[in-house]
């Protein structure tokens, strides 16, 4: 079995890391370069940066952040938020990102997934899906969780894989920022149907929550933010817990 990955997520707004609940009520969580270096030292397997301001001006700031981080941190960096074109992807990959994450742009232009995979390799293309439970299923939302896309999340994940996505970053809007656990029904429903890795996101409050997403939710990796940003747990503590529960994890850089 491949090692399960623990991935801190850094939402960046105006060059600062922030965290909210269900995508709103943002509060400051620190300097992105300092936090990234700390997580690298603690044993993070990867880092995800999401530019939640995503204006043209801020994208330049994001590229600068990625460039600084890539000099300090020697694990894969995935960067997303407002990427709309091959040129946007190229800017961040040249700045030092290893992967790019696309969300709203992939929904409005699914062929962007294929074009990105063809140009950079599918291992570079992460399709982020923000899903909200509706009835007996889950609907895809875009524009930072504000706009219903009229797509079933499971069907969209299957299509994204077929188009060339190398990974799915799956966020439960219902669970995001609440620290009460991931939506493992959603995680399992999508993980069980795909041949590419699924990163579970939204809801981590304890090491047990991460374990459940990897075990019950069948995710390949877990994304977490506030439990690390505010010092509730270190990455090393979480990974030791996962190892104690029998999951394969990498324990040192």
UniProtKB/Swiss-Prot annotation:
Q: Name one GO biological process term.
A: L-histidine biosynthetic process
Q: Which reaction does it catalyse?
A: 5-[(5-phospho-1-deoxy-D-ribulos-1-ylimino)methylamino]-1-(5-phospho-beta-D-ribosyl)imidazole-4-carboxamide + L-glutamine = D-erythro-1-(imidazol-4-yl)glycerol 3-phosphate + 5-amino-1-(5-phospho-beta-D-ribosyl)imidazole-4-carboxamide + L-glutamate + H(+)
Q: Which Pfam families match?
A: His_biosynth
The annotated pathway is: Amino-acid biosynthesis; L-histidine biosynthesis; L-histidine from 5-phospho-alpha-D-ribose 1-diphosphate: step 5/9
Query: What Gene3D superfamilies does this protein's entry cite?
Result: Aldolase class I
Name of the molecule in the record: Imidazole glycerol phosphate synthase subunit HisF
Cystine residue pairs: none
- EC number(s) given by UniProt: 4.3.2.10
So where's the catalytic machinery, residue-wise? 11, 130
Q: Where in the cell is it found?
A: Cytoplasm
Keyword hit for tRNA-binding: no
Q: Which family does it belong to?
A: Belongs to the HisA/HisF family.
GO CC annotations, alphabetized: cytoplasm
What assembly does the database describe for this protein? Heterodimer of HisH and HisF.
* Annotated source species: Dehalococcoides mccartyi (strain ATCC BAA-2266 / KCTC 15142 / 195) (Dehalococcoides ethenogenes (strain 195))
Recall the taxonomic lineage recorded for the source organism. Answer: Bacteria, Bacillati, Chloroflexota, Dehalococcoidia, Dehalococcoidales
**What UniProt keywords apply to this chain's record, in alphabetical order?**
Amino-acid biosynthesis, Cytoplasm, Histidine biosynthesis, Lyase
User: What functional role does this protein have?
Assistant: IGPS catalyzes the conversion of PRFAR and glutamine to IGP, AICAR and glutamate. The HisF subunit catalyzes the cyclization activity that produces IGP and AICAR from PRFAR using the ammonia provided by the HisH subunit.
- One function term, GO molecular function aspect: imidazoleglycerol-phosphate synthase activity
């Amino acid at each position: 079995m491949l090692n399960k990955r623990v991935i801190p997520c850094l939402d960046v707004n105006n060059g600062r890391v922030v965290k909210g609940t269900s995508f709103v009520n943002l509060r400051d969580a620190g300097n992105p370069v300092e936090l990234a270096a700390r997580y690298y030292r603690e044993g993070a397997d990867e880092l995800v940066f999401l530019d939640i301001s995503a204006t043209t001006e801020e994208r330049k700031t994001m590229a600068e952040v990625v460039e600084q981080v890539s000099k300090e941190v020697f694990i894969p960096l995935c960067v997303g938020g407002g990427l709309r074109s091959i040129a946007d992807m190229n800017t961040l990959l040249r700045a030092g990102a290893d992967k790019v994450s696309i969300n709203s742009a992939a929904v409005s232009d699914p062929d962007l997934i294929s074009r990105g995979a063809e140009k950079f390799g599918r291992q570079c293309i992460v399709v982020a899906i923000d899903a909200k439970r509706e009835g007996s299923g889950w609907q895809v939302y875009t524009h930072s969780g504000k706009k219903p896309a009229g797509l079933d999340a499971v069907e969209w994940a299957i299509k994204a894989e077929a188009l060339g996505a190398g990974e799915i970053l799956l966020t439960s809007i219902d669970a995001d920022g609440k620290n009460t656990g991931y939506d493992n029904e959603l995680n399992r429903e999508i993980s069980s149907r795909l041949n590419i890795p699924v990163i579970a996101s939204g809801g981590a409050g304890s090491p047990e929550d991460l374990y459940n997403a990897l075990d019950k939710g069948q995710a390949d990796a877990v994304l977490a933010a506030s439990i690390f940003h505010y010092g509730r747990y270190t990455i090393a503590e979480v990974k030791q817990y996962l190892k104690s529960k029998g999951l394969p994890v990498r324990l040192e850089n």
